[in-house]
Structures are given as structure tokens and as C-alpha cells.
Amino acid sequence: MRTKIIAIIPARSGSKGLRNKNALMLIDKPLLAYTIEAALQSEMFEKVIVTTDSEQYGAIAESYGADFLLRPEELATDKASSFEFIKHALSIYTDYESFALLQPTSPFRDSTHIIEAVKLYQTLEKYQCVVSVTRSNKPSQIIRPLDDYSTLSFFDLDYSKYNRNSIVEYHPNGAIFIANKQHYLHTKHFFGRYSLAYIMDKESSLDIDDRMDFELAITIQQKKNRQKIDLYQNIHNRINEKRNEFDSVSDITLIGHSLFDYWDVKKINDIEVNNLGIAGINSKEYYEYIIEKELIVNFGEFVFIFFGTNDIVVSDWKKEDTLWYLKKTCQYIKKKNAASKIYLLSVPPVFGRIDRDNRIINDLNSYLRENVDFAKFISLDHVLKDSYGNLNKMYTYDGLHFNSNGYTVLENEIAEIVK
């Protein structure tokens, strides 16, 4: 197992694209700090160092928990190659057989990305390097230089037969480079047949080069912070509002997100309903904020669970995560009431939503149908989907949440089960 790995973060002060960008504040901390924190939080490295030409950058590095290495004068110019400063760092820190190069211009490459990439490197030892890549939005076959007269003479592709989706191409995004030290010092690069790709999404791959990139990063980080703070507060406010319901028991218990929480239902087939839905919550949060804290005193004869649509929008979400939290939740239900009959409702399709993809929803439903053995899986597709596989627009007011027609359909399906 390749365990002795050092993280090298290069931070030169004299950037041409955006002056002093590594020290610029991205909302609440310097750009450089995002990469330092991600490296430390990953716990994949024995040491994290910043190689820099700037005492100021060195001070920033130390304040966020990293060591720093001041480059010699000949490596402090924009003419110095990455190979040269990496070689210099490795000549100082000689005890490491492998290293990761983490460029600070990729602030949205987080600890999870690092963990996954390092584990890929550790488990597939026939490869000497792992490089993060992202899908290219322009195929290389249509990228050409202009001639001296700014004409398109080099664009000689037969565009009548061109299909932009015919070839899927990737390019290094600059976020993560991992290599065996000896291999890198010999080849002087990270690429080739002994290198493996670690694929990242477009947003996480943002590489800051100029002012426009930095302004985009500010917008993205503001969105992340706002969503995290507002949603967290709203979820906990709603949990506090439902304390009485958590202390009550009815024959039908509803557990889930807003599709339950927004449903004004008191009885189904004249059977009392205890609606414990929490708007905005996902399966992990419901387990950690409610189930694990044992806020629910007991469960009814029939328990219906609605999760998944808020899971799939979580960064770095995996189907296995949803399955695990569902299983833990159902184990708690059975612990409280061994006689409870548990039903897992399928994730409803959406209509025209940019934040959710029906292909991902269908894939999750198929996975849950095949792997859930701790509850009865109930598919709602036959009543919710239109002929195109979308949520029928007659059942929704925003493409995601149900209107009264949608809730009538849902009530009818549950009524058939509990009759």
C-alpha cells in the first residue's frame, strides 16, 4: 500500500492573469486556504507543504496548518517549470515515496475528491500517476488556430457531418496530480499509459486564472454558503416545530422530505396519520438529526418512507449512501416497533428541473428496488409519469413538488396498501 505521501501546494505570488490571486479573499478566507484545508481534512497525507516565493504566502500557509518551503530565487519566476519546483520540494522532503500536487487555483476540489483520488492511486498500483480530469465542452477536432489574416482557413472539418456528441473527450483540470516520486523524476510529467484518470464534475473543476474566473468562484461559493446555512436552519426550525408529532404515535407514520411535509393529511382510509416529513431534508440528515438522536418515540403499524430526491443533489452523493441511511433508519423503526410494516416509496420523476435528472432518479430507483430487503419497495412510476417519462405536469406546480392532484394520486396509492 502506498502510504507515505506528501501534499505539495504550489503558490507563486507573481501571477500574470490575476495579481496575487492566491492571497485574494474568496468570501471568508484566502484562495490558498481552500486547498490547504481540503488536503488536511482528507487525512491522506503525512505532510502538507506550500512551496512559494512569498513570505506572505508562507504566513498564510502556516496560519491554516500547513508547512511552507521558500523557493530559491531561480525558481521564483514565471519561467520556472512545475517540474523544477516539485523536484526542489522532493529534494528537501526525501522521506516520501509518492506526492500529490494540489494547485490552489482549484478551490472546489474538496477533501472527498482528494480521498477518492488517493485511494485510486493506492489500490491500483500498476499505475504510477493519477490525474484529475473533467469532460471537455468543446471537442479538440474543432479547435484550430487563426491564420495571419484572421480567416478560418485552418477550420477544414466537414461541418455538415460534424456531431459534437460523437466523441467524448477529457482534459486535465489542474486540481489533483498524484505520482510515484521516482517515476515522475524520470519522466518529468504525469501522463501516459501508466497514468489513470480521476473524473471530476464541471463545477468542482473550476480553475481560477483571471478576474472573471475569480468572480465566478465568488458566485459559486456564495451559493454554496447560502444553501448550506439557509437549508440547515430551515431544517432544524422545522424539526423543532414538529416536536409534538415526534412524541405522538398514529397507525400510519410518514417519514421523509417536503413531499410529505407539504401534505396536509390527517387520515387515510379513516386511519390516523402522523406526518413526520421535514422539508429540505435528505436521508443522511434525517438519520443524523432525528433517528440517531431518537427523537421519534414510536412508529405506527404502517410506515411510509419518502427519500432520494434531496440525496441526488448532494455533492459527491452515491447510491450506496442512500441505501445505507435507509437501512439504518429502518433498523431503528424495527427497534421501536417490530410489528411495523415499512414501505419505501420510489423517488418521483421531475418535470423540467435543471437541478434534478430523471435518468439519475431512474437509476436510483432501480438500485433501491434491487437492493432494499429491509422494506417493501413501492414504485409510483405508473401513476406519476407522463408518456415521456417525466412527472406529469398535472400533478405539480414547480416540476418537483406535488399539487392537490399529485397528492390525490399519492393518497390513493397509500390507501390501497393500508385498506
Swiss-Prot record:
GO molecular function: hydrolase activity, acting on ester bonds; N-acylneuraminate cytidylyltransferase activity
Catalytic activity: an N-acylneuraminate + CTP = a CMP-N-acyl-beta-neuraminate + diphosphate
One Pfam family this sequence matches: CTP_transf_3
Segments forming a coiled coil: none
Subcellular location(s) of the protein: Cytoplasm
pH dependence of function: Optimum pH is 9.0-10.0.
Record-listed E.C. numbers: 2.7.7.43
UniProt GO cellular component terms: cytoplasm
Alphabetical list of InterPro entries matching this protein: CMP-NeuNAc_synthase, Cytidylyl_trans, Nucleotide-diphossugar_trans, SGNH_hydro, SGNH_hydro_sf
Activity regulation (record text): Inhibited by the CTP analogs 5-mercuri-CTP and CTP-2',3'-dialdehyde.
Superkingdom assignment: Bacteria
Cofactors demanded by this protein: Mg(2+); Mn(2+)
Keywords recorded for this protein, A-Z: Capsule biogenesis/degradation, Cytoplasm, Magnesium, Manganese, Nucleotidyltransferase, Transferase
Function noted in UniProt: Catalyzes the formation of CMP-N-acetylneuraminic acid (CMP-NeuNAc), which is essential for the formation of the capsule.
Protein family according to the UniProt entry: Belongs to the CMP-NeuNAc synthase family.
Subunit text: Monomer. May form aggregates.
Name by which UniProt lists this protein: N-acylneuraminate cytidylyltransferase
Source organism (scientific name): Escherichia coli O18:K1:H7 (strain RS218 / NMEC)
